[in-house]
Each structure stands twice: as structure tokens, then as C-alpha cells.
């Protein structure tokens, strides 16, 4: 007997998420007193048949039992394999396991497609995208190839790019993997194809005060970075890119709108503020004509503190054809929110999601041992000296980012590093005015500066001196006490002390060193902080300062990296 049970999963927004059929198989046992009850008792043949049936039934049960055991063993092996590939880091706020039915297909796609010429992009768009990537890269001599997430995203989005219906895609890939261009390339292609494939529509809108697409991000710094990325080379496509943030006055905004805005980069709250600008009549109609929307750092934009503004902004843009969610992490809470809001979203992920970048050299510094004796600030200062004198990046100034868990401690650390240890250091928190923040981070997001000839010689002399090991770690520095060369000189090292405000999405060009002054308490924080270095196949170092209170899951990070495990 076979019974079929149909199960429907229903979510609070009224969407049917999935329909499954679960088949339950029931094995009927043969009852005494059935058809065989008319057979004579004591018959030898009947006894033989009964014995045969009994043996067959016994074998059947044994075979069924064996199958169940095999399935159980397979399940146990799968769970064991999964546990070998995943590592539970942190106290709470875990990350979703990287599992979806497209992973294997995506991996094959990346292996098959290695050139931008193999992706469906208009020739002029392809050329422009390659030039944008080249301009944004530190190594301008190497040949430009699409990164795995760029291959996956461009390939999938181009499939039905111009269909006039809502399509939702969720891009998720490791930090520093080229996600910005993974969504910008299809966006640029979409805008140019509208001009070519629908000339009548294009003629009717090309001189109108409209916004054709929007990229929403959570911070001022990200608005500025994406705007710079898209405008860093001369415009060869005729695409008007504008930003709407605290650094743009209303008059400039109005001028931008009059000349047609093809791509507007802003935050959800600033986008909604268009409805309150008196000089803009019917802002609601402008928002309704937006057809392509990107939520970059979507896990932030859809968390509790941002969700209301983000939801209002999406609701105002009611005629969207493409919605792209982009993030370097998929926290469990974000995954639940995304499933409720966008049950039909197509995941576009890479196998390395939630893994630390391959190019990271992760080092532990124990502040509990001598000579620090429990002083984390001493361990931090000594580590900065080690970075300054280690002989890496010869001829260029070095940069280092120090991450702290709470903004109230930023100023204290900055003052001690500057006044007691003589480091060139600045601090940055969300309490600062927007323009001040942009000025402070500019040296860290720009390519590294070359040293002067005098600085190069001092740098070389210092790097030639003897080295001594730092206690409680696997790093060494120049033996400053025994050196007579430039004893009061610290090689050019810029240090930025900040919180998670700058751990999201920012491309710190040439930053090879990150120090985790406080141990990140969640896997999300660790992935984003460590991901400020070793971006786009570059190398980098992360130093984590620990003490007696540090949990074993934090101390295990170097092993996690070595074993290529994903964080959960």
C-alpha cells in the first residue's frame, strides 16, 4: 500500500515557497485466516510452501534492513564530510551552509569559461568593463580574466536579461572576489541594450528627468567607492552615473536628474528623501520608472536596523525588472528574511563562500606572555613595528588597518599608539561627519605611494639589520636596540584604527596587513574584517591578538585556513 502526502510550505507574506510529495511505503504482513486458511492442515506441500514464504519474508526483511543501514551509513558519511568542510566559529549569529543545487553547475561554468569574450556582453560594454577592472587593479600589466563570481553572475543574468518581468538573483561570494563588477557588467549591458533593441523607447526617455537604475548600499564610504569605480575612466558608453549622498547638494542633484540618470548610487534613506525635496515634483513617478535595482551588502540592508528603510525604498520602485542582492556572507537571519521576501530568488554563489581568502597568512599573537604580560596595546605596538621593519613592499609606503569591537575604545588606542609609541595613526568611527571620514580613508583606498629616494635608502638600511623574534608569536622584527641606523625613524607605515563600519565592501588598495586588536565574536565579523586584505588574488597578512580569555574557536583560525574550511 502506498500513501502520498502533499506538503505545502506557506510563509507569512502569502507566497507558496515549495510543494513536496512525501511517499510513505507500508509493508503489509500476511495474516492468519486469510486465503490460505482453506488449505488442509498437516499437508507436507503446504508446510513446505509456508516455510518457503517465511524464508522469503525473512530475506525481504533482511534486505530492507540492509538498505536502511546503507542509507544510514551514507547519511552519516555525508554528515561527517560536511562537518569536515565546515567550522563553527563564534558565539552566535552563524552563517548559512553553502549548499544549493546550482553549486556544481556553477563550478563547471567557471572551469569552462575563462575569458570575457565568452560571456554575452555587447562588445563596447565588454571593452569598458575590462578597462574598469584594469584601472581598479594594482597590477595593470596582467591580462584581465573574469573572476568566478563574475563568470557566474554575467552568464546567469544575461540569459533573460531583457525580459520585461521581475527577476531576482542573489549574488554571494567571498570577500575581494570582484562582486561589484559581477553586477555592474550586466547592468551596463542592460542599459545599452535598451538603447539598441528598443530605439523608440530610448528616444522617448533619453532627454527626460528619469532614473533608470539604482545601486543601494549602507554607507557613505561605499557610495563613494562604487561611484569612483564606475567613473574612474572616460565614459565611452554614454552612461550617466551619479551619486546622492551628504556630499552632494540639492542643486547638483537637480542638475543630475534633469540630464537623465542612468545609474544612481545612494543609500535607502537618501533615496526616500527624494520624496521630500520640494523642488522635485512627483518624485514617486521618478522612482516608479526605475527598472534595475541592486542591493549591495544586502545582508546589512535587510537586517533589523535597515529593513524598514530598504523595504520602503523597494516598495516605491514598483516596476522593477531586475533585483540583484549582493553580499560576501549569508547570515542565517538574512537567509530567512530573503526567503520570506523573495522566495523565487536564484542563488549565484561560489564554492569559496564563507572561506577566508587563499592569499591570507594568518598569525596569532599572544598578549598573555612575556614581554607583553597581558598588555594588548603593547602587543599591538610591537606588531606594528614588526610590519614596519619586515622588508615587505620595498619602495612603497605600507598601510595597516586595526579593527576594534567597540567604537568607544578607538580614540584610546589611537592616542596611545600615537603619543606613547610614535606611530602614524588615525581613528575613524561612525560618529564623524561624512566628509571627514572620506578624507581619512582616502590614503588607504588609493594605490600605495612610492617612497622618496631618501626614504628608500633608510628603508633599505633598516631592513638589512639583524632580526629578533616577537615573544608569543611567529613573527620577527629588526633589532632596533642594537642598530645605530636611523634609530628614531619608523618606516612609512599608515595605520587606521576603526570598527566594523569599514569592514564591509571597501576595497583598501595595497593594504597587506590587518590587525584584529579584538577577537571577532561572530563568523560574519571575522570574514569581513579579514577580507580587507588579500583581495582579487593578492596576498595579505592578518594578525589576531589573543589573551587568556580567548576561546578555542578563535585560536583555531590558522588551522581552519590551512584545512580550507568554510565558517558557519
Swiss-Prot record:
Record's keyword annotation contains Acetylation: no
GO cellular component: mitochondrial matrix
Motif placement: Q motif: 143-150
Top-level taxonomic group: Eukaryota
Stretches for region Disordered: 36-64
Feature: compositional bias, Polar residues: 36-49
Location of the Helicase ATP-binding domain: 160-348
Keyword annotations: ATP-binding, Helicase, Hydrolase, Mitochondrion, Nucleotide-binding, RNA-binding, Transit peptide
Family, as annotated: Belongs to the DEAD box helicase family. MRH4 subfamily.
Notes on the domains: The Q motif is unique to and characteristic of the DEAD box family of RNA helicases and controls ATP binding and hydrolysis.
Listed name of the protein: ATP-dependent RNA helicase MRH4, mitochondrial
Native species: Candida glabrata (strain ATCC 2001 / BCRC 20586 / JCM 3761 / NBRC 0622 / NRRL Y-65 / CBS 138)
Amino acid at each position: 500500500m502506498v500513501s502520498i502526502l502533499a506538503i505545502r510550505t506557506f510563509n507569512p507574506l502569502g507566497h507558496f515557497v515549495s510543494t513536496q510529495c512525501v511517499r510513505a511505503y507500508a509493508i503489509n504482513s500476511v495474516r492468519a485466516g486469510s486465503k490460505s486458511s482453506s488449505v488442509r492442515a498437516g499437508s507436507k506441500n503446504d508446510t513446505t510452501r509456508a516455510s518457503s514464504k517465511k524464508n522469503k519474508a525473512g530475506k525481504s526483511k533482511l534486505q530492507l534492513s540492509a538498505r536502511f543501514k546503507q542509507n544510514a551509513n551514507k547519511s552519516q558519511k555525508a554528515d561527517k564530510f560536511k562537518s569536515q568542510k565546515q567550522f563553527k566559529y563564534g558565539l552566535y549569529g552563524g552563517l548559512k551552509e553553502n549548499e544549493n543545487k546550482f553549486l556544481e553547475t556553477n563550478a563547471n561554468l567557471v572551469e569552462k569559461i575563462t575569458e570575457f569574450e565568452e560571456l554575452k556582453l555587447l562588445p563596447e560594454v565588454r571593452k569598458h568593463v575590462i578597462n574598469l577592472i584594469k584601472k581598479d587593479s594594482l597590477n595593470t600589466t596582467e591580462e584581465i580574466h573574469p573572476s568566478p563570481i563574475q563568470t557566474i553572475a554575467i552568464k546567469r543574468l544575461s540569459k533573460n536579461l531583457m525580459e520585461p518581468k521581475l527577476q531576482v538573483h542573489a549574488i554571494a561570494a567571498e570577500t575581494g572576489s570582484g562582486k561589484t563588477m559581477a553586477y555592474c557588467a550586466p547592468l551596463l549591458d542592460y542599459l545599452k541594450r535598451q538603447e539598441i533593441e528598443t530605439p523608440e523607447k530610448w528616444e522617448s526617455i533619453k532627454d527626460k528627468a528619469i532614473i533608470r537604475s539604482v545601486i543601494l548600499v549602507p554607507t557613505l564610504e561605499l557610495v563613494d567607492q562604487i561611484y569612483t569605480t564606475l567613473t574612474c575612466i572616460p565614459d565611452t558608453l554614454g552612461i550617466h552615473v551619479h551619486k546622492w549622498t551628504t556630499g552632494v547638494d540639492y542643486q547638483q542633484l537637480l542638475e543630475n536628474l534633469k540630464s537623465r540618470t542612468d545609474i544612481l548610487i545612494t543609500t535607502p534613506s537618501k533615496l526616500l528623501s527624494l520624496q521630500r525635496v520640494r523642488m522635485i515634483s512627483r518624485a514617486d513617478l521618478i522612482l516608479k520608472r526605475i527598472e534595475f535595482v541592486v542591493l549591495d551588502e544586502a545582508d546589512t540592508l535587510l537586517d533589523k536596523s535597515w529593513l524598514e528603510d530598504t523595504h520602503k525604498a523597494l516598495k516605491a520602485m514598483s516596476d522593477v525588472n531586475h533585483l540583484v542582492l549582493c553580499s560576501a556572507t549569508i547570515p542565517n537571519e538574512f537567509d530567512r528574511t530573503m526567503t520570506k521576501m523573495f522566495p523565487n530568488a536564484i542563488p549565484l554563489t561560489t564554492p569559496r563562500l564563507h572561506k577566508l581568502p587563499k592569499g591570507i597568512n594568518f598569525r596569532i599573537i599572544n598578549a598573555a606572555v612575556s614581554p607583553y604580560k597581558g598588555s594588548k596595546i603593547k602587543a599591538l605596538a610591537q606588531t606594528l613595528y614588526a610590519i614596519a621593519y619586515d622588508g615587505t613592499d620595498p619602495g612603497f609606503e605600507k598601510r595597516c588597518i586595526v579593527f576594534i569591537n567597540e567604537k568607544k575604545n578607538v580614540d584610546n588606542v589611537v592616542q596611545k599608539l600615537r603619543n606613547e609609541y610614535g606611530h602614524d595613526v588615525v581613528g575613524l568611527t561612525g560618529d564623524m561627519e561624512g566628509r571627514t571620514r572620506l578624507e581619512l580613508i582616502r590614503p588607504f583606498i588609493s594605490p600605495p605611494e612610492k617612497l622618496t629616494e631618501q626614504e628608500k635608502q633608510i628603508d633599505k638600511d633598516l631592513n638589512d639589520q639583524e632580526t629578533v623574534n616577537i615573544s608569543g608569536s611567529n613573527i620577527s622584527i629588526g633589532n632596533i636596540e642594537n642598530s645605530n641606523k636611523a634609530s628614531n625613524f619608523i618606516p612609512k607605515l599608515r595605520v587606521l584604527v576603526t570598527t566594523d563600519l569599514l569592514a564591509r565592501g571597501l576595497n583598501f588598495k595595497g593594504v597587506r596587513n590587518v590587525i584584529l586588536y579584538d577577537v571577532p565574536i561572530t563568523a560574519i565579523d571575522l570574514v569581513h574584517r579579514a577580507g580587507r586584505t588579500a583581495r582579487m588574488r593578492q596576498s595579505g597578512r592578518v594578525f589576531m591578538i589573543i589573551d587568556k580569555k580567548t576561546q578555542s574557536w578563535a585560536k583555531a583560525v590558522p588551522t581552519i585556513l590551512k584545512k580550507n574550511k568554510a565558517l558557519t
